[in-house]
Amino acid sequence: WMEPAVFAVVLPELFTPENAPRFEAARAIIDTLPEGLPEVSARLAALLLPLGEQGTRKALKQLRCSNALIEEVTTLVREAGLVPEEKTAARAIQARRLLGRLEPDPLRRLLALCAAHRPEQAAAFAALQTAAGRLQAENACCRVGQLAVNGRDLMALGAKPGPGLRGQLEALLEAVITGQLPNERKALLAAVKIELDP
């Protein structure tokens, strides 16, 4: 570890009177996270968490980090307040929604960060990671692009192009994620027909 005095020069935002006490807590969290270059984003997120999303983005820009690293770290900071669902069905829905927003590796890093930050919930975050892994293995539908229908299919039924079309696809995705509809072309098109011709 660098000495706090060095960190204070490199990242002065961390050593304001309100943030300085959080530095030692951040060090303890970072020490529990996996090591290695692929994991640097989770470790940076743990360090910069007290700065919030905008402060993290600003600090990383000052350090001249790559845009990809800045985006991942700020996403991890933004999502770090995640509360894991306890019930199996709710956990599966939560895992699908997370996979809809995050790629698998950033999601794994987020869950590791959350477990390190809140060790009393580590088992719940591990269960959420297991649920996400199972969904990936099943190639479950978690994003609009994974739906069995697309915008052209909806327009063929009479849907108008534009933002409303995207909204219809997102509504179908939500129905699939929550188990109201299967991700099957026939069932999805039938639901759209009902919506277009009430």
Ranges and model annotations:
Residues 117-198:
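Charged substrate- and nucleic-acid-binding regions of tRNA-handling and nucleotidyl-transfer enzymes
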Residues 1-123:
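Conserved, hydrophobic alpha-helical core segments of structured domains
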